[in-house]
């Protein structure tokens, strides 16, 4: 939901995104395509050390299985790296925090208030425990209206304002990652795309609404706004490449956030080999997509089984689940 609030000269702007559609099943590009394009040569390399905080509802959503939560967060982080590649930005997971016992702030459906509280908590507590550039709160709380995310515009590297909140609104990791990328885009000075903005698709990352067949690329407008943010603010923190000791890892295959040996990867670059389909995901086995119709998520309650499409490593949502609810 679009929101642009200013209270005096010091109050930061806030912008969000609304969710209006079903998820698409288009496969995201492989990690081997991430870096080295001519487009990203327009930007100097930047490194964002990110902390993702999962609220208590996220832990309960996964039946208290912290490994499952951690896996989900890394899947989101991997997708973020793909989306920010054209800007020559590498996302490094500086930390994962899971509120396993209770929420450490009062998470409300009022997105602006939750964002404010999360920013204050980050400044007071999180920065004292772990150095990082940005923090995103992932919550199961239904944010007000159609809002699924909110962030401060231009807040990157500010102790209180380098934050965003994202509702865990989809069972497909890249859809949630697209919302988180949108909020990170706001933190990097990007506004919502107007009708004149183009990324080669109907909807870009900074579109005000998540529409059907959403693109996972930033528009020409977003790239210019990002360049303006860099010129005006010169954020020094995101110039430094983080040490490996400052990152967290997970046994999930395909962790492009930190190099790790894997049979699908080139042993030198740890990028997927050219002839392989995938390196991770519930629909990836032996570096290949599983056959269409393979069950990847067993039915629960009145939900139907979800199946692999044969075109993606993701476990796509069964459309019958949406038609019947």
Swiss-Prot record:
Report domain Peptidase M12B positions: 46-242
Q: By what name is this protein known?
A: Zinc metalloproteinase/disintegrin
SUPFAM superfamilies named among the record's database cross-references: Blood coagulation inhibitor (disintegrin), Metalloproteases ('zincins'), catalytic domain
Question: What organism does the record attribute this protein to?
Answer: Bitis gabonica
Name positions with the PTM Pyrrolidone carboxylic acid.
Answer: 40, 258
Summarize subunit and interaction data from the UniProt record for this chain. Answer: Heterodimer of bitisgabonin and gabonin-1 (bitisgabonin-1) or gabonin-2 (bitisgabonin-2); disulfide-linked.
Report the cofactor remark: Binds 1 zinc ion per subunit.
- Span of the annotated motif Cell attachment site: 300-302
Q: In which tissues is it expressed?
A: Expressed by the venom gland.
């Amino acid at each position: 939901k679009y929101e642009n609030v200013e209270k005096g000269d010091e109050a930061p702007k806030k912008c969000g995104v609304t969710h209006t559609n079903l998820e698409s099943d288009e496969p995201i590009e492989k990690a081997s395509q991430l870096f080295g394009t001519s487009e990203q040569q327009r930007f100097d390399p930047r490194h964002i050390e990110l902390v993702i905080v999962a609220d208590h509802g996220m832990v309960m959503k996964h039946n208290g299985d912290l490994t499952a939560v951690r896996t989900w967060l890394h899947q989101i982080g991997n997708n973020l790296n793909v989306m920010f590649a054209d800007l020559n930005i590498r996302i490094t997971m500086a930390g994962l925090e899971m509120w396993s016992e209770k929420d450490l702030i009062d998470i409300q459906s009022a997105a602006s208030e939750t964002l404010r509280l999360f920013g204050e908590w980050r400044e007071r507590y999180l920065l004292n425990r772990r150095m990082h550039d940005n923090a995103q709160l992932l919550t199961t709380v239904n944010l007000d209206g159609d809002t699924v995310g909110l962030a401060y515009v231009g807040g990157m590297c500010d102790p209180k304002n380098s934050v965003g909140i994202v509702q865990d609104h989809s069972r497909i990791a890249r859809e949630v990652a697209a919302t988180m990328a949108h909020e990170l885009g706001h933190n990097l000075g990007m506004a919502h795309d107007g009708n004149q903005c183009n990324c080669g698709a109907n909807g870009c990352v900074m579109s005000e609404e998540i529409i059907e067949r959403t693109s996972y690329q930033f528009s020409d407008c977003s790239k210019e706004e990002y360049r303006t943010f860099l010129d005006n603010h010169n954020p020094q923190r995101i110039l430094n490449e983080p040490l490996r000791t400052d990152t967290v890892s997970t046994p999930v295959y395909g962790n492009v956030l930190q190099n790790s040996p894997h049979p699908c990867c080139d042993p030198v670059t740890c990028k997927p080999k050219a002839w392989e389909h995938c390196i991770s995901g519930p629909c990836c086995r032996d570096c290949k997509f599983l056959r269409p119709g393979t069950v990847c998520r067993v039915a629960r309650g009145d939900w139907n089984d979800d199946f692999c499409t044969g075109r993606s490593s993701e476990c796509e949502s069964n459309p019958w689940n949406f038609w019947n609810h």
